[in-house]
Design a protein with these regions (language model features):
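C-terminal motif of bacterial Sec signal peptides marking the signal peptidase cleavage site
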Residues: 19-21
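Short coil/linker segments at helix-helix boundaries
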Residues: 159-179
Length: 437
């Protein structure tokens, strides 16, 4: 992703210009240094910079981290914090959203901002000079990001405007397209993008790979109950040999677990780079609301979610922070005890915890922790769901048991905690394989 980070500041120069020597008729001339959609995108580097602008929108904490749109809408999480803090998030958590809600506008606006940027890259590529293979890779990544945005839009809102080309201002009054048209566009974009390179053939983390494309395409097919097509898409991911379940579930959510063998698509964050911070505040939003913990306490996991785990499941301690858990404190050599202060559920989220030793020199609104958008475990479980729908239960159980085996072999001691208040001890058979009986 080095190239993407180094170019991101160039995107912001597209709205600026320099005026050279003055003359009487300079106002009637187009300044040669002005970048517009007409004179930009002339070569592969400029088209790549346009793609960077598309990726830049993924950093929005309101959309692609999807805890606001997905977690809070489920029984797995409560808004958290206190009722007077971010009341609009409480409306989401309790299904009281209104069209006038700021957050509804944020989601809608950010998704369509991605789509607009992708449309421009795709449309302007026709006039780009350079290696056609490189141009196609840029275009196909933009198509994936456009499909990803429409996937969230149609899943959240149903009928939405379908915009698949760059629009002029006078064209911006649009009707809502039927859901079927949106799904058709998503499928079309993803099928075009399946020719993208695999993980092994990209030399930059964060790129869209064929595995990421097939994973989202399989999820789309599953949503639409196209089970044969679902199986074909997920089989492409599994048979590629590019992904595997890492032995330690907790490792995935630590800094060293970023872009690991289980990561299918991951949104990259980076801080302290020459062009500025490209970090995230999602972790600050969700870490415990406590001075010693340094978070704001939103997105608290619920008792309902805890009850979904089987006794002794090691994943519990990598999902929940419990009252009484002890962590290393900000001052080296000291500790503090989490109280889950103002958590309406009595718990906090563990996956977003950042050790104090990794926060040194970082702005609390700009942490360099990636968003694990799609993991191989999710692919396997979605694949199993599709196989089950086609009465291929033996194959489905095999995939489910792969995930269960990894879970039961995960260490029961969290290396980033001093101690955990939750008792994981269990004398029965831990997470046994699912069988036909």
């Amino acid at each position: 992703m080095k190239k993407i980070y180094s170019r991101i500041s160039l995107y912001f120069t597209l709205a600026t210009f320099l005026i050279g020597a003055c003359s009487e008729d300079f106002l009637n001339r187009t300044p040669p240094s002005v970048f517009t959609e007409i004179n930009y995108f002339k070569n592969v580097d400029e088209l790549e910079t346009g793609l960077v602008a598309c990726f830049a929108m993924l950093r929005s904490g309101f959309v692609f981290d999807h805890w606001m749109t997905d977690d809070l809408n489920s029984d797995d999480a409560d808004c958290g914090s206190s009722p007077g803090d971010q009341p609009l998030l409480y409306d989401i958590s309790y299904s009281r959203m209104k069209p006038s809600s700021d957050y509804m506008w944020y989601f809608w606006s950010d998704y369509y901002s991605v789509i607009a940027r992708c449309n421009e890259v795709i449309d302007r590529s026709a006039g780009t000079k350079g290696d056609p293979v490189e141009i196609e890779k840029i275009v196909d990544q933009a198509k994936y990001l456009r499909a990803l945005s429409y996937y969230h839009l149609v899943s959240t809102y149903g009928d939405v405007p379908l915009v698949n080309r760059f629009l002029n201002p006078e064209e911006l009054k649009l009707r809502r397209a039927p859901v079927e048209e949106i799904w058709t566009q998503i499928e079309s974009d993803l099928k075009d993008a399946t020719i993208l390179p695999t993980v092994s053939n990209w030399n930059e983390s964060g790129r869209v790979t064929s595995g990421a494309v097939y994973s989202l395409l399989g999820k789309v097919y599953l949503t639409r109950k196209k089970y044969q097509l679902t199986n074909a898409a997920f089989q492409k991911v599994v048979s590629s040999g590019e992904y595997q379940l890492v032995p330690d579930y907790g490792f995935i959510f630590r800094h060293e677990g970023e872009n690991c063998a289980e990561s299918v698509f991951e949104i990259q964050h980076k801080t302290n780079i020459p062009d500025g911070n490209l970090g995230t505040y999602s972790e600050t939003f969700r870490m415990p609301r406590d001075y010693a913990a340094g978070g704001w306490g939103f997105d608290t996991p619920t008792k309902d979610l805890l009850n979904e785990f089987e006794p002794g499941d090691p994943r519990i301690i990598y999902t929940f922070i419990f009252p009484g858990d002890v962590f290393p404190a900000q001052k080296e050599g000291t500790t503090f005890t989490v109280e889950c202060f103002e958590s309406p559920t009595g718990y906090n989220a563990r996956k977003v915890w950042i050790p104090w030793s990794e926060r040194a020199g970082l702005n609390m609104l700009e942490y360099d922790y990636n968003c694990r958008y799609m993991r191989y475990a999710e692919v396997l479980l979605l694949y199993a769901e599709s196989l089950n729908e086609l009465n291929k239960q033996d194959s489905a159980r095999m995939l489910v048991n792969m995930v269960r085996a990894r879970a039961r072999n995960t260490p029961i001691t969290d290396p980033q905690r001093v101690s955990c208040a939750y008792d994981l001890s269990y004398t029965g058979e831990l997470l046994p394989d699912v069988t036909a009986s």
